[in-house]
């Protein structure tokens, strides 16, 4: 993973950061540039880039960044989109009336963004699956299992379903031991299931 720097204080920042730990400048990932941007917030939906090479551009935070703090990507301010290139791929999330579900969702989105960063670097970034007949798009469902409705992680026709319980470290480690696996990670699930998606294209 590439290291980045804050345009305000030059401190090193990381892909997951939403604020510089040194000067508290707002940060966000600019997907079109494959770069972390530093921003001055003129309003909740108008952020001015402080990076010299982006100073003529205006951005806004992804809806899930602004309202749920589960994302740190930004979108061009003039765009009609409200979701970033990562969040737009997520079709279903756990119900948010349970605080644990918000934590699980956040962890899943974080792992998905790391996976998508790699896809960007390889120039095979997936696009959203807008309807069931679209064989080239990709969609993610993050589902919580229920007593009579277990959730199996897998891929089918451009839809990747992940058991959101995998974001619970205890559940995931218990499953790893039960399955006799050397390791079991959220990022690994994204890589594995996306392999089926790309193979089918």
Show which residues each predicted segment covers:
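Active-site recognition of the HExxH zinc-binding catalytic motif
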Residues: 20, 184-201
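N-terminal low-structure segments adjacent to metalloprotease catalytic domains
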Residues: 1-129
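Short pre-active-site segment immediately N-terminal to the catalytic Zn-binding motif
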Residues: 169-191
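Generic detector of contiguous secondary-structure segments
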Residues: 16, 147-150, 184
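Residues forming anionic-ligand binding surfaces in small-molecule and nucleic-acid pockets
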Residues: 84-93, 164-175
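Auxiliary, metal-adjacent structural segments of Zn-dependent hydrolase domains
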Residues: 103, 107-169
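Short, solvent-exposed loop/turn and secondary-structure capping segments
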Residues: 21, 96, 173-175, 199-201
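Active-site-proximal structural scaffolding
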Residues: 13, 77, 108, 155, ...
């Amino acid at each position: 993973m590439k290291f980045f720097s804050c345009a305000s204080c030059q401190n090193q920042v990381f892909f997951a950061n939403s604020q510089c730990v040194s000067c508290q400048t707002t940060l966000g990932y600019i997907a079109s540039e494959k770069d972390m941007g530093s921003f001055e917030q003129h309003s909740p939906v108008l952020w001015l880039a402080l990076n010299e090479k982006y100073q003529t551009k205006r951005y806004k935070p992804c809806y899930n960044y602004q309202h749920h703090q589960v994302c740190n990507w930004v979108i061009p301010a003039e765009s009609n989109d409200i979701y970033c290139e990562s969040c737009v791929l997520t079709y279903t999330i756990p119900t948010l009336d349970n605080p644990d579900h918000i934590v699980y969702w956040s962890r899943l989105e974080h792992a998905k963004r790391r996976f998508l960063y790699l896809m960007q670097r390889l120039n095979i970034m997936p696009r959203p699956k807008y309807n069931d007949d679209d064989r080239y798009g990709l969609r993610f469902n993050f589902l919580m299992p229920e007593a009579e409705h277990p959730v199996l992680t897998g891929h089918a026709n451009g839809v990747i379903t992940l058991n959101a319980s995998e974001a619970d470290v205890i559940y995931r480690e218990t499953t790893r031991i039960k399955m006799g696996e050397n390791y079991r990670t959220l990022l690994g699930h994204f890589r594995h299931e996306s392999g089926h998606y790309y193979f089918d294209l």
